[in-house]
């Protein structure tokens, strides 16, 4: 049986494989544009970066990791940023992918959905399922940022301190990673990569403005076709977490 780290690394590689095949099809059909290729390139690089980060010892791959970071910076300029929330660090991480991925190795509960004034797309809010049982304050937000091609941005806030048990699937153990073969969507694990770079200061400023515009009374969990019935309703006290974020300098 694979460990949690092994499964996460394999899932990252499989996701990179899927995006690599999508990029290959674009190249074969000569349908190249920055809008269609940048999200794929960004996801591929971060998938490998995430998988390599689990290799022990890290000192074996200083050149490769540095190269990946340099290549990623050409695709999307980013900067590290950490803020403090109470006694613990509150870190912001971002992932962009062609589809929303509700399963990223952790269990989440949807507790809010909001139409943002500065965007035509709604933003969904989640908390760790073990927020109350294990005092885990990890949160994430999912929002479509463009529709052609579709790109979904997932922003993670805080760190998981829960002891979530990953679901084992023997499919991973027998899967040979070959980059000239397409893995079906039903086989590919749904992973939202979390690399070690914080979101850009520009996105942080946008998030700050959006949070200020969000009235607690406007939050609702509606019958969205994609998210409906996947998560139970939220309690109003949970949104205070994001209200406190908006007040941070």
Curated annotation (Swiss-Prot):
SMART domains xrefs: WRKY
Keywords: DNA-binding, Nucleus, Transcription, Transcription regulation
Cellular localisation: Nucleus
Record-annotated DNA-binding residue ranges: 97-165
Residue stretches spanning the membrane: none
MF terms in GO: DNA-binding transcription factor activity; sequence-specific DNA binding
One GO term describing the cellular component: nucleus
SUPFAM superfamilies named among the record's database cross-references: WRKY DNA-binding domain
Family: Belongs to the WRKY group III family.
Role noted for this protein: Transcription factor. Interacts specifically with the W box (5'-(T)TGAC[CT]-3'), a frequently occurring elicitor-responsive cis-acting element.
Annotated protein name in UniProt: Probable WRKY transcription factor 64
Source organism of the structure: Arabidopsis thaliana
